């Protein structure tokens, strides 16, 4: 059975989301500026994790409305929940606004509209923070970069599955990131299937209990009817016994009458003899 995971990337505009997706998809870093990642014309990628083959589809939430204007008010995410298995929430480690918006803007909307979908937080452009990659090794202040520990704290605050960092330029950390996304997304699918199975089982149990209750009620009614019939039979038997007793009494009375008649007859006969 095919295992498919849909990954939706969200985050502020112009921070390198599309470049990250294209670098991972093509395995090449391109300095071309992309407006957005059009996944409609791209085939899903296959990743193999512990002998499990998972197909991942990459989708970018570009944040633009139908007129091509960047949206300034919610909803910022355009996809329906049934089209998403996991969110990849991105910020640039050189852009503190994009970092802060992970909490105040993107996480807020995810929790409001997609509460059951897991989130993986990732800081990109880590090459800018590495001393050897500073432009011409000029003295650039590192303090304005988002540190790794800040990223971890943010992940904990928004209840993300984890925090990761990567560099599109160096192609560093990309494979590990998307392997995690594939695992998290597929785990979410399995959880939803288990919940559906539990729901079906609960319904079946309720129907079974209702049927059993109906059967019990029917059996109780039958038993009550049988008891009533038995009582009626007993009453009839009692009546029959009473009738028999009455008959016996009548017979006894008849016998007494016969005896009296016989005695009277004997007396008459005796008297007759005496007269003669």
UniProtKB/Swiss-Prot annotation:
Main location as per UniProt: membrane
GO MF annotation, one: GTPase activity
UniProt keyword terms in alphabetical order: Cell membrane, GTP-binding, Lipoprotein, Membrane, Methylation, Nucleotide-binding, Prenylation
Propeptide cleavage-removed residue intervals: 274-276
Biological process, per Gene Ontology: actin filament organization; cortical cytoskeleton organization; establishment or maintenance of cell polarity; mitotic cytokinesis; regulation of actin cytoskeleton organization; regulation of cell shape; response to bacterium; signal transduction
Membrane topology classification: Lipid-anchor
In-chain residues carrying the UniProt-annotated modification Cysteine methyl ester: 273
Coiled coil start-end: none
One Pfam family hit: Ras
Localization annotation: Cell membrane
Binding of GTP, residues: 11-18, 60-64, 124-127
Residue numbers spanned by region Disordered: 199-276
Segments carrying motif Effector region: 34-42
One CC-aspect GO term: cell projection
Source organism, top-level taxon: Eukaryota
Family: Belongs to the small GTPase superfamily. Rho family.
UniProt-recorded name of the protein: Rho-related protein racO
Source species of the chain: Dictyostelium discoideum (Social amoeba)
Higher taxonomy: Eukaryota, Amoebozoa, Evosea, Eumycetozoa, Dictyostelia
